[in-house]
From Swiss-Prot:
GO cellular component, as recorded: chylomicron; high-density lipoprotein particle; low-density lipoprotein particle; very-low-density lipoprotein particle
Localization, UniProt: Secreted
Protein's UniProt name: Apolipoprotein C-II
Record keywords: Chylomicron, Glycoprotein, HDL, LDL, Lipid degradation, Lipid metabolism, Lipid transport, Secreted, Sialic acid, Signal, Transport, VLDL
Lipid binding: annotated span: 66-74
Encoding gene (name): APOC2
Species per Swiss-Prot/TrEMBL record: Saimiri boliviensis boliviensis (Bolivian squirrel monkey)
TM ranges: none
InterPro entries to which the protein is assigned, alphabetical: Apo-CII (IPR008019), ApoC-II_dom_sf (IPR023121)
Function of the molecule: Component of chylomicrons, very low-density lipoproteins (VLDL), low-density lipoproteins (LDL), and high-density lipoproteins (HDL) in plasma. Plays an important role in lipoprotein metabolism as an activator of lipoprotein lipase. Both proapolipoprotein C-II and apolipoprotein C-II can activate lipoprotein lipase.
Keyword Glycoprotein listed: yes
């Protein structure tokens, strides 16, 4: 499936490349307006800001202190467990690399 996906992606990019090469644009003056990159950046910034505002308002509407406390407790317990098991794993790997002395 991976090779089929790569082949399909390659063909799509190839067709798009030929489309771009086959459609010449009329010459425009560079000082006519803001560059395309600037317009895209402003557009993406606007989308990002609206998404942040929507997520923030949704979070504020659904905020429950009890759930927040449970999430914080689960996070602290899980990070403690992960750090413990990471230490054990590191010790095991180091002892395997050193060998028996």
């Amino acid at each position: 499936m991976g090779t089929r996906f790569l082949l399909a992606l390659f063909l799509v990019l190839l067709v798009l490349g030929f489309e771009v090469q086959g459609a010449p644009l009329p010459q425009q003056e560079e000082s006519a307006g803001p560059a395309l990159l600037t317009q895209m950046r402003e557009s993406l910034s606007g989308y990002w800001d609206s998404a942040k505002a929507a997520a923030s308002s949704l979070y504020q509407k659904t905020y429950l202190p009890a759930v927040d406390e449970k999430l914080r407790d689960m996070y602290s317990k899980s990070t403690a467990a992960v750090s413990t098991y990471a230490g054990i794993f590191t010790d095991q790997v180091l002892s395997m690399l050193r060998g028996e002395e």
